[in-house]
Amino acid sequence: MKSFEERKAEVCRRRKIIAEKRRKKNKLLLCAAPVIIAVGIIITVNFPDIFPLNSAKNESTDSSTLSPDTDLPTLEISAPDGGYGYEGYLAHDISELVNANPWNENISLAALPVFRVKNDTSENKLKELITTTAEKLNLKGFGSVSNDGGAVFAESESIKITATDTDISVYFKKAESLPEKYNFGYYASYKDMKKSAGYLKNKYSALFKDGKYILNLYGGDCDIYGRQSYHISFYKDSDDIVQKIINYNFYKTRFTPNDNGELEQISTDLPNLGDKIGNYPVISPDKAKELLYDGKYVTSAPKAIKKSDKTAQTELVYRFAPWEKYYIPYYRFFVAEESTGNESLEKQGFKIYCAYYVPAVEEKYIANMPLWNGALN
């Protein structure tokens, strides 16, 4: 079992390998970066409360006027090459898993955009991004910008900034300490992490002056020792629910601690969404659940869905990974697996919540609708 963050790190490593091979072949700079599979940086003043996925506080009834386009091409669901572990979250109850996903089942959506994955950002554009980031944070003393074959970077004695096709990150060679009253450690409580988020937002506010940003305090699952953890990110708010969904899925900024609870890295997701295929009609969560029980889903979980299984939670998310050709919206269903493979954890009431993905666009637009065949797909 691997968490989202562990799977993401592995995907990042593989995408860099893929990008390097493509770069050598085409003599172009193609960079690789963190990849969001589900499910995993930016800022202003007011933070809403963060709450469980189906909390009563997350019952926005926003609707979108976005209509489906006509003459849309069919889409292909690409298969992974394996080796990523399965996506499972260890918790006593689904309510412990939290995030600030703006979607909920009360929101009416007729269509959502689909994008073709692009990994061809020019080296000059990436250099420009590094320069802009350094200026915003008032970082100085950088040498020339270099290309290591999978990314473009510049570094000083204390900081390294790296830009790729899908993100930019600021790495502190000597991690930044927070004041003693803040707990930013791996296993800090929800309350402590929320306080740390406010401090970090204020300290690095230069990054986030273009609007209001929402705190996405996500996580709540445990490791095999029963230790709960949360993670800090931000995404830009919008009055348009579709844009808000896009911002949440593609343009988050994360603050990452080291083992000592010090700030080690700030990274912002910036994938290129310039190649839009079109606005595709979206099915309802109920229709997606029918497809789920028909076996038409993508999962890394080791077991098939049974008719008797109950879904614990539903989310709308975009997936993107090295093997994907398109950024497509999916419904992500969580299903509890009582057997954790660890007797001690089971005695403590832990379950593993496995993730199953059903394409959210109408089935007729999927050229190869996934069908679970007993193997990791």
List each model region and its residues.
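Internal signal-anchor transmembrane helix that establishes type II topology
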Residues: 23-45
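Disordered, charged N-terminal biogenesis/targeting segments of membrane/secreted proteins
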Residues: 1-25
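Segments that shape or occlude catalytic/ligand-binding pockets
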Residues: 194-331, 335-344
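Preferential activation on post-signal-peptide N-terminal prodomains/segments
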Residues: 50-246, 250, 270-277, 372-376
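A short, surface-exposed beta-strand/turn
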Residues: 162-173, 243-268, 339-377
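Short coil/turn linker and secondary-structure boundary residues
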Residues: 2, 6, 121, 188, ...
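Alpha-helical structural motif
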Residues: 4-7, 129, 193, 284, ...
